[in-house]
Structure formats: C-alpha cells, structure tokens
A protein has these predicted regions:
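Structured nucleic-acid-interacting core domains from mobile-element enzymes and related host factors
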Residues: 12-36
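Conserved helix-loop functional segments at active or binding sites
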Residues: 16-20, 41, 61-63, 97-100
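C-terminal reverse transcriptase regions that engage the nucleic-acid substrate
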Residues: 1-21, 156, 166-168
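RNase H-like nuclease module associated with reverse transcription
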Residues: 31, 49, 61, 67-197
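Conserved hydrophobic/aromatic pocket- or pore-lining residues that grip, position, or stack substrates
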Residues: 10, 37, 55
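Short acidic, Gly/Ser-rich segments with clustered Asp/Glu that frequently serve as metal-coordination loops
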Residues: 38-46, 116-119
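Acidic, metal-ligating active-site segments
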Residues: 43-59
Length: 197
C-alpha cells in the first residue's frame, strides 16, 4: 500500500515537472557567486537543521546542494559557518577547475549569507570564547577573505535563494525563488511524426 502510494506520488511529481528546465542566460562576465542558507532546527520531530547552497557562474546556476543534518546543532552560528566553509571549498574548487581549463574568472567570488554575525566573523580575526568551537572554519574563511580570494556579503532573508530547498514556502514565494533559479517552463511544439501519443 505504501509503495503504491509512493509510486503514484512520484509519477504525479514527474508529470508536473515535464516541461521545466534551466534557462541559461547569455553570460556578460564570468564571475562566481555563492548563496548559503540554513533552516536551523526546523524539524520539530528531531530538531535537525536543513542546509543548502547554490553556486552561479555569470548569473547561471551551475551547482547546488541541500542536506538535512545528521546531528542537532546547538548554535545556528556554528552551523552557518560550517556551511559557509563548505560553500567556500566548492567555490575554490570550481575556481581551480576553471583555471586548469584556462577560463578566466573575473574578480573575487562573492559568497552571500543572511547572517550579519557570520558575515562579521568572516572578515574579523578577533575571537571570543563563544566562537572557539568554530575556530578552524573561521580561520579558513578569514584567510580567504584577507587574501582577497573570497568576499563574504550580507543578503536579506527575502533575497536568499536557497530558501527554496531549505524551508517550507508559500506558492507565491516558491514561484519568486524559482524564477531566481532560472527554472523555466518550456513549451514544446511537436510537428508531424514528432508528436507524443
């Protein structure tokens, strides 16, 4: 019974997304941007958090991930910083890949987060006793910021694109964020023998 319901729901979902795809815009400049977001302790059953991040190249989405955490985090700052460190590693890996392919990336990659506190820690090596538990991630990101290999900036929660993967949203909010992902409903015109019956 459960497997039948799961199969039915899966087919309904797949039927509903058949015409959707990513619309790649013409690139005006090759620059990397990352967006990182945490839905801290969002699951009321087990208090685990969901994290997600996106990476854009020239305004086009090229990489994304979301994941429910395996452990409960007591501090949202620690979780946000771990996610920022993971996103930084992905961006640096992409930079090295583009360098090997002799593709020049313009400027310093920008990493957007909706936490003013985390953004402040990223550009300030002054620690206090409450941030010792995230010291390695802080040092890693600060090192990249000070070397001008990364620029961490604040973005308001309303503009935070990874919400589409990490939080339950209203239909209007989902549609708004879906447009920012450059996910588009394509219409296909079949002619003659190309028709699907």
């Amino acid at each position: 019974m459960i497997i039948g319901r799961l199969a039915r729901d899966s087919f309904r979902y797949l039927h509903g997304i058949v015409g959707y795809g990513f619309h790649f815009k013409p690139i005006k400049g090759l620059f990397l941007e990352g967006f990182a977001n945490v839905d801290w302790a969002s699951n009321l059953n087990d208090w685990r958090s969901t994290v997600g991040y996106y990476v854009y190249l020239g305004g086009n989405l090229i990489q994304w991930t979301w994941k429910k955490q395996k452990v409960v985090f007591c501090f949202s700052t620690k979780l946000e910083y771990k996610l920022l460190a993971q996103d930084t590693i992905e961006i640096l890996w992409l930079q090295s890949l583009f360098h090997e392919l002799e593709i020049k990336i313009l400027g310093c990659p920008i990493l957007w987060c909706d936490s003013i506190g985390v953004g402040s820690l990223a550009s300030n090596l002054v620690f206090h006793s409450r941030t010792k538990h995230i010291k390695i991630d802080v040092h890693f990101i600060c090192e990249k910021v000070l070397a001008k290999e990364l620029d961490v900036r604040y973005i308001s929660t309303e503009e935070q694109i990874p919400d589409v993967l990490t939080k339950p949203l209203s239909e209007a909010r989902f549609d708004q964020l879906q447009n920012k992902l450059t996910v588009t409903l394509f219409s296909f015109n079949f002619r003659g023998s190309d028709r699907i019956s």
